[in-house]
Amino acid sequence: MIDLKFLRENPDLVKENIKKKFQDHKLPLVDEVIEYDKKAREAQQEADDLRAKKNQVSKQIGALMAQGKKEEAEAVKAEVAQISKRLTELEPLEKEYQDKVLEDMMKIPNIIDPSVPIGKDDTFNVENEKFGEPVVPDFEIPYHTDIMERFDGIDLDAAGKVAGNGFYYLMGDIARLHSAMTAYARDFMIGKGFTYCIPPFMIRSNVVTGVMSFEEMDAMMYKIEGEDLYLIGTSEHSMIGKFIDTINDESKLPYTLTSYSPCFRKEKGAHGIEERGVYRIHQFEKQEMIVVCKPQDSKEWYEKMWKYTVELFRSLDVPVRTLECCSGDLADLKVKSCDVEAWSPRQKKYFEVGSCSNLGDAQARRLKIRVKGEDGKKYFVHTLNNTVVAPPRMLIAFLENNLNADGSVNIPKALQPYMGGTEKLIPKH
């Protein structure tokens, strides 16, 4: 959510930003916000003036009664009653206008960074940099579930009977590999100075609307029936929510947290869930990182964060590249974002395994996360988030890039301590 004062003073700039995001249907919201904000402020001013007048006039009643001027006192009482009646009309009206302003402001996208490429959808995303040499081996690489089945490592049929499509059972060495990746990612981020956190796996609606747009909420979140609770789609949401309604000491910034959690998503978007596989599913695990920092530091943190993910993937012998997300591919709260994509030798192309985002002060405004500076003034922080590793997708990239012609899978040195010293997985079939 952008600053209301900024919108008042720069309506054309806000409209231009909406156009850059190819959301022309939201253009009327800007004028609507200005109109209702004006009405709300006028109602507030009238109410303030009437309260002052009521206080002033009310003082006359006692004096008039003491002077025996009962008739004049009754006239003043009638005037006070009229003022009170008008105030009872104004107060709900002011709230109605303010609620309308807030409702519209929540729909207006954040101002994107000037460096963001302009484009309608993800086909306009721009490749930034490649890390590691993409290799296509001289033997055929099976589909990832077929590789897992060679190790008796996955059972999709049983999961389908138990929970439906979009779920899985991981077993044996593949399950161990999954757990090893999350443990390694946890220690990797702790080594970068991040504080390890196990957050709530459910959050209230005020946190949900504080961290994401209504469109994202509808497409992603599972609601607990009869409760004001939602299953998290990413631990970023509950980690950022930790700071809701707080005024923080500037000297303690930045807050850097990393967490492991299960994640639950409806995947109602254009892609939907995968028929067979673990790429796009309803339930998965993820190691996430967030940063809460001073506004002037967020660009530097953004660069650090995506580089951490690249470093981790390269330590597991997986080639990756980064893609700069274009304006139309950015979620409404994001200022700037890039995807990290891993090389798939089977598909001979890259596929998304994570994303890094700078949200400016959008989440902080919604959640009222502020900082008190040395001068005593309060301001909103900036928030950032980044995928460290999402093991189901990482498994795909890892298995394909570390597969040998005989069906065995190499375990990189970085991961071996988390696999009991195992250097290679040997298939059972």
Question: Positions of the model-derived regions?
Answer:
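N-terminal alpha-helical targeting/anchoring segments
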Residues: M1-P134, E149, G153
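TRNA-recognition modules of translation machinery and tRNA-sensing kinases, especially anticodon-binding
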Residues: L27, K130-H429
